[in-house]
Amino acid sequence: MTQVTVKELAKVVDTPVERLLQQMREAGLPHTAAEQVVTDNEKQALLTHLKSGHKAKVEEPRKITLQRKTTSTLRVAGSKSISVEVRKKKVFVQRSPEEIEAERKREMDERRAVENAARQKAEEEAKRRAEEDARNQPAAGQPASAPAQPVAAAEPVREAPAPAAAAPAPASAAPSADARKRDEQRRPDKPRADDRNARGGDGERKNAPHRASVKEKAPAPRVAPRTTDEESDSFRRGGRGKSRLKKRNAHGFQSPTGPVIRDVAIGETITVGELSAQMSVKAAEVIKFMFKMGTPVTINQVLDQETAQLIAEELGHKVTLVSDNALEDSLAESLKFEGESFSRAPVVTVMGHVDHGKTSLLDYIRRAKVAAGEAGGITQHIGAYHVETERGMVTFLDTPGHAAFTAMRARGAKATDIVILVVAADDGVMPQTIEAVQHAVAAGVPLVVAVNKIDKPGADLDRIRSELSVHGVTSEEWGGDTPFVSVSAKMGTGVDELLEAVLLQAEVLELKATPSAPGRGVVVESRLDKGRGPVATVLVQDGTLRQGDMVLVGSNFGRIRAMLDENGKPVKEAGPSIPVEILGLDGTPDAGDEMSVLADEKKAREVALFRQGKFREVKLARAHAGKLENIFENMGQEEKKTLNIVLKSDVRGSLEALQGALGGLGNDEVQVRVVGGGVGGITESDANLALASNAVLFGFNVRADAGARKIVEQEGLDMRYYNVIYDIIEDVKKALTGMLGSDVRENILGIAEVRDVFRSPKFGAIAGCMVLEGTVYRNRPIRVLREDIVIFEGELESLRRFKDDAAEVRAGMECGIGVKSYNDVKVGDKIEVFEKVQVARSL
């Protein structure tokens, strides 16, 4: 008999020693150390213990599924056989004794509860019948009540005394029993009360036919009026059944007896579908009504307030006009703030014609090289800077002077307190100078005229004063109220006097602001930065703007994540008259949008969504109105050639300026259509849009990403980059000129006068002519003029000089001319030789 230690046994069975010792202790063995010896009997005992424990853990299967499959062959006509396979499946579930006992108890409890309910119901039914018989007995009379007593006396004695009220009126039991039988046949799921009745139910069932025969022989007044199955069923169920019966018999919908007048709320704009929904009529009814009025509409068409009011009133509804600006009014009320006001720095806008030195003047004031960084040396964005001078702080807005930036200059005049009008002394008043004066007058902003480049020879200040006085700008030297300052942005001459004049105007205006109020301002510029998202340059006009504020900017909103000054340095807050860049908006706002700080995000989101919806509705209504107005004008005309453009820019202001400038190009035959535009780089979606609309991709100070470049290369799209606005406009003009085609012009080459007429057997009438002007060429189109009136137009067929064919004959020489298919040449006629030349057209 081999003996091993606990340690060796653990190694053999591949288990830890500690676990083996624990199992041996559970098996009742006395081993406690790894060196103790284990006999064969102890091994057997340990094995038996482990097997029993394993069997206890493994549960017997509680569900057995038996499947049986039989196959048979079915013969059909045509000696064909079909195999039919029948599958049967049975599932046997083994339940534990506890579950069986619990199920048995539950069934007994349910049976007992059903019997108690049936007994109680039978007692109530008997009591009710007794009460009904008692009520009907006086009306029935004595003759009818006599035969009932023997039947009641002959009723067998039950084992237990039944309720006293069950004895009278046994004749009425049969009808109720018959009614119950009919009810049970009609509703088989309802348990029968007779089967679950108390003791004596069998005797009652045996006597039921006899009682029925007695009832048939009884006089009619003895029996209560018969009820329908539903009524008897409702009586057995009690009062609750009566209410359910009434509910079941009641109609679900009652038709209105007259027209329903509804209150219809109509805003500034409403679609046909929304109007019909408010009136609870089909949209087809509204469309039919509009057709009768002579206006074809669709279900999604936007109606104005007056039209919608007319439709609703004609259809008989009550109209309530709603102001769509209620939300805006509540916003304006919430933004009111009262606090202590302090003086603020003036906001000065520098305006003038292109290349008159606006940015160079600001460059000298700021002591920074800004003009050198602009593409082409011209300003194409609004630049906002604040400068600390010896006399105080001044905020400058530098606007572009190019003709395309009209809207941008108008925004600059709107957001400013004082306008510096820069006029070059050597160039004088130019178109954009006059436009800047008009913007300043329209905004009610005082002007300070800076006559720049006075260091150049040929500067004439009196000429500039005279030209500006024509447009209502009169200098103080001439008795007006506009200060004129002579400056030189290159040398710095007169800059201090200019700043002094600006600050003097600011003192007269008494500019005030409340720094403790929530921030409020205007968007100067906006762009889409690839790394930082939408970035907006904001000029704070009142209050203090802080990092973390919830701002509403036009139809965009967001929480300020960061603020940067004009030098790109982060700042925590910005007071009045300070320009800053803010990050955190959900989109790029339009330049000129007002910015407000709100208390909560919910209000900001609500107003932003309202403004977006309102802008969309107004845009759709305007577009549809334009289509209806132009439908008759364009009828019968040839379709214009269109140059489609997808335009992407670095900032919102430049995008608007380019869209306006390009949209103004064209004539009656060609036009420019900007099918897509946005702020940011050229993306893959822009390239797909250009491909779908057959458009040209223009990038202004932006570039295309890898996906867009791949599509452009694969599809052969035309994509161009620009950084100067002149180049875009010139290229688009050239493209439109190429689309115009060419004009056909006629150049008169020579004129010959007929001096004599000869006859030729080959050519017919030959005109002997003297060439008066130019040169006469063979095989060129000609006109025959008689008394300066064209009588024939054809081709010069034969040209000879001294009986020899000639290719051309110059002025002062004689020649013979044969006109093809024309023989009515007379002396004194003139023959005009010309050519048709195609000439390129221009806009």
UniProtKB/Swiss-Prot annotation:
Gene3D superfamilies: P-loop containing nucleotide triphosphate hydrolases, Putative DNA-binding domain, N-terminal subdomain of bacterial translation initiation factor IF2, Translation factors, Translation initiation factor IF- 2, domain 3. GO terms for molecular function: GTP binding; GTPase activity; translation initiation factor activity. It is found in: Cytoplasm. Residues 452-455 are annotated as: G4. Transmembrane segments: none annotated. Residues 136-177 have a biased composition (Low complexity). Residues 398-401 are annotated as: G3. Residues 352-359 are annotated as: G1. The keyword Transmembrane does not apply. Its main location: cytoplasm. Disulfide bonds: none annotated. GO terms for cellular component: cytosol. Residues 96-135, 178-219, 227-236 have a biased composition (Basic and acidic residues). PROSITE patterns: G_TR_2, IF2. One of the essential components for the initiation of protein synthesis. Protects formylmethionyl-tRNA from spontaneous hydrolysis and promotes its binding to the 30S ribosomal subunits. Also involved in the hydrolysis of GTP during the formation of the 70S ribosomal complex. HAMAP family: IF_2_B. Belongs to the TRAFAC class translation factor GTPase superfamily. Classic translation factor GTPase family. IF-2 subfamily. This is Translation initiation factor IF-2. It comes from Pseudomonas savastanoi pv. phaseolicola (strain 1448A / Race 6).
